[in-house]
Amino acid sequence: MSLSHGTGAPAISTPLTLRPPPDNTKAILTIAIGIAASLVFFMLTRNNLPHVGDNIHSLPHGGSYIDGTKSINYRPPASRYPSSNLLAFAPPILAAVLFFLTQPYLATRRSRCVRCFVVHGACTNHT
C-alpha cells in the first residue's frame, strides 16, 4: 500500500492511455511537393543569359544601340537556353502529372467487381 504525499490516503493509479502520434505525412508531402514545384519553376524561369553590354547599356534580350561613339548590335537569345523554352516543356510535364494523378483512381476502378462493386479478387461468390 502506497501513501500519497503523507496524507494517509492510498494513491490511485490510473491506467495510461496510449494514443498513436498524429499522422503528419499528408502535410509533409504537401509541403515537399510545393517546395519542389517552386524550385523547378524558379530554375526554369531564372535568367541564365550571358551579360551583354556595359554598365549603362544592357541588352539581354537582343537589340541594338547606337550613339555618337559606340554602337552595339546583339541578336536575341537562341532556343538552346532553357528560360526561353519554358512553355515547350509544359505539355509533356502536364501529361505526366495527369497520368500519375489518375492512376490510383483507374487502378481501383479496374479491380472492382462488376456485380457487387467491391474490391476483391476473382468474383466467385456470384455464380
Swiss-Prot record:
Residues 46-85 are lumenal. The chain crosses the membrane at residues 25-45, 86-106. GO terms for cellular component: host cell endoplasmic reticulum membrane; membrane. InterPro entries: Plant_vir_prot (IPR001896). It is found in: Host endoplasmic reticulum membrane. It comes from the Viruses. Keywords: Host endoplasmic reticulum, Host membrane, Membrane, Transmembrane, Transmembrane helix, Transport, Viral movement protein. Belongs to the Tymovirales TGBp2 protein family. TGBp1, TGBp2 and TGBp3 seem to act together for cell-to-cell propagation. TGBp1 is the main movement protein that physically cross the plasmodesma with the viral genome. TGBp2 and TGBp3 would facilitate TGBp1 function. This is Movement protein TGB2.
